[in-house]
Design a protein with these regions (language model features):
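Acidic helix/loop microenvironments that form the catalytic cleft of cell-wall polysaccharide enzymes
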Residues: 2-10, 168-175
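"A position-specific structural signal for the A-helix of alpha-solenoid helical repeats
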Residues: 3, 7, 11-14, 141-144, ...
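Hydrophobic-face positions in mid-chain alpha helices that act as interaction patches
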Residues: 24-146, 155, 161-211, 215, ...
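Short, charged low-complexity intrinsically disordered segments located at boundaries
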Residues: 4, 62-68, 179-180, 236-247
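C-terminal functional modules
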Residues: 172, 188, 192-298
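TPR/TPR-like alpha-solenoid repeats
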Residues: 11-12, 18, 152, 215
């Protein structure tokens, strides 16, 4: 039951921007999230990958093409915090390629790296189910639940430090299951007492969202996409800047605000067809029409 209660708080958090009484919404989220903790929630995971018949979807995609890469956007956040997860995230592929990757870390907008295969650094967990790495895939991680609790407390003006640290510890433990990299208790303590603590003290909500972004880089990027849209609507900004110059055109946003409808929906549903548009405007709604919980009308 704790799994279903926990996952429901994603949706309640998405709805906060639409809530007439946001504090009441946050209080409900906090009460129910704490109930999930009390009920023993430790993550909703798919622990089924055996390297034979079951291969993690992210790993299967990377393995078939080898052009997914570690991003400088994420790595810069880790380096600035002396993050022990950085070596796991920014793996140079030496043991896989038989030498360090040719192009290294991927900078957003780098067209050569974007078109290259077997040439960039990549997260070690891409070997999940392929090369002796057997780790779960998250439907919802333990760290996400505690980040939700920490965010809600910060928005309510409450002390969020303990829940924030629990969330970060859960993410560090999750990363440490990948490869041979060890993250000791001393490493964890030093990390939480270092630049991370300084940034949290300066702006708790900002650092909660940044650390959630780092944690969900593992395999929860869809929820990160939701957080970007949610926070841009709720706060007017998101603390991690997207720097790919190819995401703008003529000064207009080209980072999708929503996922597109499928062709069968467009063809068979007149309401969807109207939203999709026609001619030169066909499909542009994904860049201009927010989803309803992020301020849109559709």
């Amino acid at each position: 039951m704790s799994i279903y209660i926990s996952i429901s708080h994603r949706y309640l958090l998405h709805e906060a921007g639409r809530a007439t009484d946001k504090n009441a919404q946050y209080a409900q989220i906090l009460e129910e999230a704490n109930a999930a903790v009390a009920d023993g929630f430790d993550g909703a995971n798919l622990n089924i990958f055996d390297g034979n018949n079951q291969i993690d979807a992210w790993s299967a995609y990377w393995y078939s093409r080898e052009y997914s890469a570690s991003s400088k956007t994420v790595d810069d956040l880790m380096v600035a915090r002396q993050d022990p997860r950085e070596a796991i995230y920014n793996y140079n592929g030496a043991d896989w390629y038989d030498e360090p990757s040719r192009l290294g870390l991927m900078t957003p907008g780098d067209k050569e790296a974007a078109g290259a295969t077997s040439a960039t650094n990549f997260p070690l967990w891409f070997l999940n189910g392929i090369s002796g790495v057997k780790i779960p895939s998250h439907l919802m991680s333990k760290s996400e639940l505690y980040f939700i609790i920490a965010e809600v407390k910060a928005r309510l003006g409450q002390d969020a430090k303990a829940d924030f640290e629990t969330a970060v510890k859960a993410s560090l433990a999750d990363y440490a299951t990948v490869g041979a990299t060890e993250i000791s208790n001393e490493d964890v303590a030093a990390y939480l007492a270092g630049e991370t603590a300084t940034k949290f003290a300066a702006n708790p909500l900002n650092e909660i969202l940044v650390q959630k972004y780092i944690a969900q880089t593992r395999d929860e990027q869809l929820e990160t996409f939701n957080d970007m849209r949610r926070c841009n609507y709720l706060d007017g900004s998101y603390p991690v800047a997207m720097t790919n110059p190819n995401n703008t055109q003529a000064g207009q946003n080209r980072l999708p605000l929503r996922l597109p409808y499928g062709s069968s929906d467009v063809l068979s549903n007149p309401n969807v067809k109207e939203a999709f548009g026609s001619g030169n405007d066909a499909g542009k709604y994904i860049f201009t029409e927010n989803v309803w919980w992020a301020g849109g009308n559709r």
